[in-house]
Swiss-Prot record:
Gene: pyrR
UniProt name for this protein: Bifunctional protein PyrR
InterPro entries referenced in this protein's UniProt entry, alphabetically: PRibTrfase_dom, PRTase-like, PyrR, PyrR_bifunctional
Motif (PRPP-binding): 99-111
Example GO biological process: regulation of DNA-templated transcription
Pfam families in the record: Pribosyltran
Organism: Nostoc punctiforme (strain ATCC 29133 / PCC 73102)
Membership in a protein family: Belongs to the purine/pyrimidine phosphoribosyltransferase family. PyrR subfamily.
Record carries keyword Glycosyltransferase: yes
Length: 178
């Protein structure tokens, strides 16, 4: 039997969601000159770039953007296997900055735990916040996003797949299950 695929967000819905997330980030940030968006590879990094462009459109302020590779900070390498790491691209000190970690989907919270550990290697931010496109629940750690594009109750065995134009050739969020 083939898996059932349901589109959760279309290209237009993703665009609107990113506009809303960018507005929320702006509202919660005292000084936009101190704002840094750090995307978690791969799709989180792409989303961080899209959010930065949206913030610049809304506010006329260029926001610093970096990309974070958490490969060596994961606690599940024995389960998922070691993947070829991508070099983090953070060409600035994070000390004193307002850092918003950006990821596509939050599930158990382990990716974010690893990202928090990785951020410490780049300085000591004033505050770290979390923005996700999709929150599917089922947390195993006490981690909660500050900015959520879409809350999506799921079964643990279901899969949420994010597709982004610059990487996958299309924009969509799909729920895959039986």
């Amino acid at each position: 039997m083939s898996a059932k695929v349901v589109e959760i967000l279309s290209s237009e819905e993703i665009r609107r969601t990113l506009t809303r997330l960018a507005s929320q980030i702006v509202e919660r940030t005292r000084d936009l000159s101190q704002l840094v968006l750090l995307g978690i590879y791969t799709r989180g990094a792409l989303l961080a770039e899209l959010l930065a462009r949206q913030i610049e459109t809304l506010e006329g302020v260029a926001v610093s953007v970096g990309a974070l590779d958490i490969t060596f900070y994961r606690d599940d390498l024995d389960t998922i296997g070691l993947r070829t790491p991508t070099k983090s691209e953070i060409p600035f000190d994070l000390t004193g900055k307002t850092v918003v970690l950006v990821d596509d989907v939050i599930f158990k919270g382990r990716t974010i735990r690893a990202a928090l550990n990785a951020v410490n290697d780049y300085g000591r931010p004033e505050v770290i916040r979390l923005a996700v496109l999709v929150d599917r629940g089922h947390r195993e750690l006490p981690i909660h996003p500050d900015f959520i594009g879409k809350k999506l109750p799921t079964a643990k065995e279901e899969v949420v797949k994010v597709y982004l134009q610059n990487y996958d050739g299309r924009d969509a969020v799909e729920l895959i299950g039986d």
